[in-house]
């Protein structure tokens, strides 16, 4: 009886799955806007695919993946040069499965990016596809995923690695834009509250977070110099840490320069401290992909060196921690990847709830004139609750879209590639998928993104001085 009731309860959701996004989440957020709800659903789909990709790397999945013709033959063992450890078929096939799932997600969102090009209002028929028909879209996505597992091996993995690295690098730049946007919005919000009332409280809050970010950044610099450099080696790491430290100091000084303050009174050290901390994370992330293991200890080595005695008992021989090989009970998701995924989730959620009306980066880049600024429309949803009809979110895009549908799907396409590279630790496969190694291109992609991050932030500061004819108020 309970099963029957469950079927009828599930059936009641079928109209929602075939209609707009506003029906799916109306019980949780009845007063939300359609533009926000749609983006949250797409973000949830991407996060769900990330969970599935992670599960595919688990050892328990080997039995099922080996049943796919030609996907995993004989549970072969492969030797990985950079960590001196044997990998069973489960780990390598997990990587191959992640590549397939990410391929399906990227194709799905790329096709939608093309389909949604130049959609101006929700009255466009294509907007109905974007905001609705969820059952069919999810079914199509599952179909693409299943089909991707039957793609012949060959050079697919190597080619898709290159595509993934390029896409992931572009998504890192998008994360940087969102981070700068968030930093400016956060600072402006708190400065406004400080001016409205209780200035001491908000000033103390600004000072506390700014100090905390700078202190964490200094700690990061110290740890990186201690564990990722050696007196007689690791020259690249010394250069990466030093140049990024200098650039962060320069960016912080620029943010409080009198000329900058004159044109942007609300620029300050809060944004600089957040950008500095993120730059230090990118520096660490880049060096974590360095092929030379002597210059790239893993996080467990940090803990071992800090907590364990440096001298062996009874003699004066130093205990040298060795890199910890990956566990064969699961995937190789390490601390760097976890932090990367955490930052990814925050940026994805922020991109789903932000609007062009509160975007500070839109004012500080060359895209401000294209932003659609609409007033809040909260009265149109009242009639939906009449006559027992389900409550729906407010359609706030009848006169103009709140964001570019095409660019949003393109961002999710690049995010799929970023997830692929993160879950596989940016390791590079050969053509026959017989080895997985860290490579220098991954290092340079990440370290270059840290420089672009700082350049982008500095540009948002100096733009009013350079583009004098543009309104940044």
Swiss-Prot record:
Q: Spell out the family assignment given in the record's similarity comment.
A: Belongs to the TDE1 family.
Q: Read off the InterPro entries from this record.
A: TDE1/TMS (IPR005016)
**Positions of modified residues (Phosphoserine):** 371
Query: Could you state what the record's PTM comment says about this protein?
Result: N-glycosylated.
- GO terms for MF: L-serine transmembrane transporter activity; phospholipid scramblase activity
The protein's location, in the record's own words, is: Cell membrane; Golgi apparatus membrane; Cytoplasm, Perinuclear region
* Residue spans, topological domain Extracellular: 1-96, 154-159, 225-239, 351-406, 468-473
- What is the tissue specificity? Ubiquitous. Expression levels were increased fourfold to tenfold in lung tumor tissues compared with normal pulmonary tissues.
Report the protein's function.
Restriction factor required to restrict infectivity of lentiviruses, such as HIV-1: acts by inhibiting an early step of viral infection. Impairs the penetration of the viral particle into the cytoplasm. Non-ATP-dependent, non-specific lipid transporter for phosphatidylserine, phosphatidylcholine, and phosphatidylethanolamine. Functions as a scramblase that flips lipids in both directions across the membrane. Phospholipid scrambling results in HIV-1 surface exposure of phosphatidylserine and loss of membrane asymmetry, which leads to changes in HIV-1 Env conformation and loss of infectivity.
Sorted alphabetically, the keyword list is: Antiviral defense, Cell membrane, Cytoplasm, Glycoprotein, Golgi apparatus, Host-virus interaction, Immunity, Innate immunity, Membrane, Phosphoprotein, Transmembrane, Transmembrane helix
Name the gene. SERINC3
Catalytic activity reported: a 1,2-diacyl-sn-glycero-3-phospho-L-serine(in) = a 1,2-diacyl-sn-glycero-3-phospho-L-serine(out); a 1,2-diacyl-sn-glycero-3-phosphocholine(in) = a 1,2-diacyl-sn-glycero-3-phosphocholine(out); a 1,2-diacyl-sn-glycero-3-phosphoethanolamine(in) = a 1,2-diacyl-sn-glycero-3-phosphoethanolamine(out)
Which organism does this sequence originate in?
A: Homo sapiens (Human)
- Domain of life where this protein originates: Eukaryota
The glycosylation sites are 34
Q: How does it sit in the membrane?
A: Multi-pass membrane protein
A Pfam family of the record is Serinc
- Protein name, please? Serine incorporator 3
Q: Where are the transmembrane segments?
A: 97-117, 133-153, 160-180, 204-224, 240-260, 330-350, 407-427, 447-467
Q: Which intervals lie on the Cytoplasmic side per UniProt?
A: 118-132, 181-203, 261-329, 428-446
Q: Which Gene Ontology biological process is one annotated for this entry? A: positive regulation of endoplasmic reticulum stress-induced intrinsic apoptotic signaling pathway
Q: What is its main location?
A: membrane
Can you quote a single GO CC term?
perinuclear region of cytoplasm
